[in-house]
Regions:
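Basic, amphipathic "hinge/linker" alpha-helix immediately C-terminal to the N-terminal HTH DNA-binding motif
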Residues: 67-88, 92
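N-terminal leader segment of winged-helix/HTH proteins
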Residues: 1-16, 20, 57-59, 103, ...
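N-terminal helix-turn-helix DNA-binding core of bacterial DNA-binding proteins
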Residues: 6-46
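Canonical helix-turn-helix DNA-binding module
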Residues: 33-65, 69-70
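Amphipathic alpha-helical dimerization/coiled-coil segments
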Residues: 2-3, 23, 84-112
Length: 112
């Protein structure tokens, strides 16, 4: 199979939503875990799993702070994450541009 340049970590639809949501923020801005959860529509456990994968790749950063008795987690896209998203979107544009301009697919479809 041809390497299409699509980052498999970002290509997962849920992680793409997370990264795209964070990328829409001005540089340096963060979202609270709860706000991100509401925007993406995930359970806390599911969001934690995806955030952990993105943080392991240095695509996002998270920080826990205390406000009295309440713990607040904030999440931000890192510079590395922004570059990865930019590369992913360019690879997607290239792939779709090739298809739209009459490029050929890596495989042929057989009709039965």
């Amino acid at each position: 199979m041809k390497d299409d340049g699509l980052d498999p970590l970002i290509h997962v639809p849920t992680r793409l939503k997370i990264v795209a949501t964070l990328a829409a923020l001005p540089d340096g801005d963060t979202l609270s875990f709860t706000r991100l959860q509401d925007m993406i529509g995930l359970t806390p456990g599911n969001l934690i799993i995806h955030l952990r994968r993105l943080e392991e790749a240095d695509y996002i950063s998270s920080e826990k702070t205390r406000n009295g008795t309440v713990s607040i987690t904030t999440v931000a896209l890192t510079g590395h994450g922004r570059k990865a998203l930019d590369a992913y979107t360019q690879a997607l544009r290239d792939l779709l541009g090739g298809l739209l301009s009459g490029g050929t697919a890596d495989h042929e479809h057989q009709r039965t």
